[in-house]
Amino acid sequence: SEEKSEAIELFKIVLQKPNFDKEILDREAKRYVANIAQAETMPEAIATKRFMKSIYGEHPYGLPSSGTIDSINRIKVSHLKKFYKEFYVANQADIVIVGDVTQAEAESIAKDISSGLPVNNNIKAIPVVKQVEKQETRISHPAKQAHLYYGVPIMKRNDPDFFPLYVGNHVLGGSGFGSRLTHEIREK
């Protein structure tokens, strides 16, 4: 349809010819800094940040995914352009298309979308996660509810047991209030 074609063309422009406007970057940086500052007062965010640092140490997984106030304030347009050039590449793109389209149409659309992207065969592998020593951390906070995290990195995502273990973890405790563990603790 015409709307679908227009949407695809618009998406190609956004993906293939991004506009790294300094004014927008500055506005979004201020918004992110405010969100990070607010999160630093919230017990769940504090616990999550400390937990990730505890189990991953200096590995990139140990860094807060939202960044830090300092890291956000240091981002320049040149950093965005470099990141785009290195990582928005055809040979690493996963394009997901959902809707009223056949597989042949979806493949054609995906090829069209990715055809304007460069290829980069020099993407660094993610470092191996090193096991950390057993530790217990307690954080004093005036919250009315405790946040308890426990865990250890045990396998890579490409391990054949990863997905079954992920589902089991989700059912037992990883899904928050929908988990069996939470049900046992809160309801019984």
Question: Which residues does each PLM region occupy?
Answer:
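Charge-rich, well-structured scaffold segments of protease-associated domains
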Residues: S1-N121, R138, K188
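His/Glu-based metal-binding/catalytic segments typifying zinc-dependent metallopeptidases
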Residues: N122-G178, E184
